[in-house]
Amino acid sequence: MDGAREVRSPRGSTLTARSWQTEAPLRMLMNNLDPDVAERPDDLVVYGGTGRAARDWASYDGIVRTLTTLGDDETLLVQSGRPVGVLRTHEWAPRVLIANSNLVPDWATWPEFRRLEHLGLTMYGQMTAGSWIYIGTQGILQGTYETFAAVAEKVGRPDDDGVASLAGTLTLTAGCGGMGGAQPLAVTLNGGVCLVVDVDPERLRRRVATRYLDEVADGLDDAVARCEAAKLERRALSVGLVGNAATVYPELLRRGVEIDVVTDQTSAHDPLSYLPEGVELGEWHEAAEAKPEEFTDRARESMARQVAAMVGFLDAGAEVFDYGNSIRDEARQGGYDRAFAFPGFVPAYIRPLFSEGKGPFRWAALSGDPADIAATDRAVLDLFPDDAKLHRWIRAAGERVAYQGLPARICWLGYGERHLAGLRFNEMVASGELSAPIVIGRDHLDAGSVASPYRETEAMADGSDAIADWPLLNALVNTASGATWVSIHHGGGVGIGRSIHAGQVSVADGTELAAAKLERVLTNDPGMGVIRHVDAGYARADEVAAERGVRVPMRES
């Protein structure tokens, strides 16, 4: 892409913008494109197939130039990765408002999106790529860890501490990019063995370098031997295998390899980002661009073969789930009629957490100093002394997770918890315990910020899977509450036409104004999750609303 260059975020406490409220989005935009963070930084692609941080390098330069001069009573407007205006607002307003990839429903198809993208009119923002709060593979790691912990409660048995474990089980998955790369470490943190398949050897090498993957096998026979030995010894191990999942999954099924858990996190949401059988890795992007319709058909046929094998494992007694990449629907379109025989991960494991407003709470140290994250880790443990799962996660993350770009951390916190962490971080900045401000955000995958019938809102109790008012309300609420930047995206995770979602990021800069904003944003944002699930009829959400004082008019008499 014209204008490509290496980008890294500034570190330290010296401002390059006019305040931390504008320095923060500037640094996080740059961090998204750090070579240690982004999948294809020269193309502005951060993760998730083609999820970009900016539409093109000229737009990137325009965003950077504007953020360095933006005042604290001004708001930058970003339309699908392109800076389109600056308006005078007020100090409580967001400094940046972002809308990415949004299309009128009848036009919300991949072919139409690609036509508009080719004209330079839009870009695919994924979830945290175009909203500038991607923190590398760690960003999805705890959610993946929690998912496999829930799987362990179904298929595993308690370890010495009485906690369900995946020890003695083998998980098969595919896709080891920015999102899928969390899977091998999440499985091993839960005590299990993981075999992860990816067509790109460089992705596997990168996950080994960042300690998300233990080792790479020399071939299928070697991979199976390593995994079966570790499973027999009840030893945690993750093994990468270079191969195409559409070939490997059916072959493992044919061999009768005893696999306990099966999922997938390839970029199936975009058929052009899934390599079909018979296409060489080096020919991938050229073939996809030359004949996109033919490539899409071939990719879907390959997905159909992979999903058919997944259903074969299901029939053989394995725990099988869709990890939110639309592979079931793509396989259905590829001609496989049992594609929905297994559930998505949210209804299977995560929805009880969403009913409590619990979801991915992440923060990054703008200083670039890992000591600041270590200090915030201690603060979180101090704030929530009775949360054993949280303590186990924070300790494991501190020991096992390598930082990518600016040091960062993620943990799942719920309604009534997130604002406590935000306020504590702000106090630590004010006192000098932290050497620079902290940015606090989340994935768009959260309790009340997504409409995605194949993922976050699949199988809602009241049938409201496709109701998209909720993420729009979420963005409006965060804008009204004082978030530093707010985003509304379309198509993240599951692909164009299948989701609407919103995000927020807030800055803890140590000021009283920041404290007031943080208390509102970090209360109201997860509060939307409780409200959404109360409205859908979830009893646990009703209990949380009553216990924690969330007002729901239709529940008031």
Swiss-Prot record:
InterPro entries reported for this sequence: Urocanase (IPR055351), Urocanase-like (IPR023637), Urocanase_C (IPR035401), Urocanase_central_sf (IPR038364), Urocanase_CS (IPR023636), Urocanase_N (IPR035400), Urocanase_Rossmann-like (IPR035085), Urocanase_sf (IPR036190)
List of residues binding NAD(+): 48-49, 126, 178-180, 198, 203, 244-245, 265-269, 274-275, 323, 493
Subcellular location field: Cytoplasm
Record's keyword terms, sorted: Cytoplasm, Histidine metabolism, Lyase, NAD
EC number(s) recorded for this UniProt protein: 4.2.1.49
Binding note for cofactor: Binds 1 NAD(+) per subunit.
GO molecular function terms noted in the UniProt entry: urocanate hydratase activity
Main subcellular location of this protein, as a coarse class: cytoplasm
Major enzyme class: lyase
Family recorded in the similarity comment: Belongs to the urocanase family.
Protein name: Urocanate hydratase
Organism: Beutenbergia cavernae (strain ATCC BAA-8 / DSM 12333 / CCUG 43141 / JCM 11478 / NBRC 16432 / NCIMB 13614 / HKI 0122)
Lineage: Bacteria, Bacillati, Actinomycetota, Actinomycetes, Micrococcales
